[in-house]
Amino acid sequence: LSIHFGLVSKCIPNLEGCTSISRVGRYPPVNYFFKPMMLIYSISLFFYWYNFLKLTKTDTSFIKIMIFFSIISLILYVLFLGENKVYASFFRRVGIYIYIFFTVLSQYLVSKKNFFNNQNKSLKKSFLKYKYILSLSLLIGGIILLPILIIKIDNLPGIKNIISWNYFLLIQTYFLLSYLYLRN
């Protein structure tokens, strides 16, 4: 829709970095679809984590707190997307990093606990291994890539967008692996 309305250029952002994720859903009329869908996604994340922790018996208070902050940060980010007030800018810039940090850390801790403490012997070890490797890679990659996302790079303007699009794709891949794991 953003391309159709001329809000972003026509390209493959994962490869070309022509637009940020937030720009795709920031402006009317696209934001009338993007924001509600992101809020539904946030609620879906709550149910995902609640059910996944329950099914895999990896229920810990610390992980629950991180997940709570992750989801609240995403909701605040979405609510303030497209707003021009000072506090909105703070939530747009900081909220998304809080969401990413707590999501990736939660994914890592849950994967680590499931992989190394495989108390439920019916758990498929290969899915647990892939989830653990992916979550560890996301955690290490996030630490390495964070300075690139924070500093201004004039000669490579699209690099931040390329990193963001692909990083979020990998975060979603973790959830896909969870689905495949639970399905088996």
Name each model-derived stretch.
Residues 47-69:
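Cytoplasmic juxtamembrane regions at transmembrane-helix boundaries
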Residues 110-184:
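Terminal transmembrane helical module of multi-pass membrane proteins
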Residues 53-54, 79-87, 145-156:
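Juxtamembrane "helix-exit" motif on the non-cytosolic side of transmembrane helices
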Residues 70-125:
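Membrane-proximal helix-loop-helix units in multi-pass membrane proteins
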Residues 1-11:
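Alpha-helical transmembrane segments of multi-pass membrane proteins
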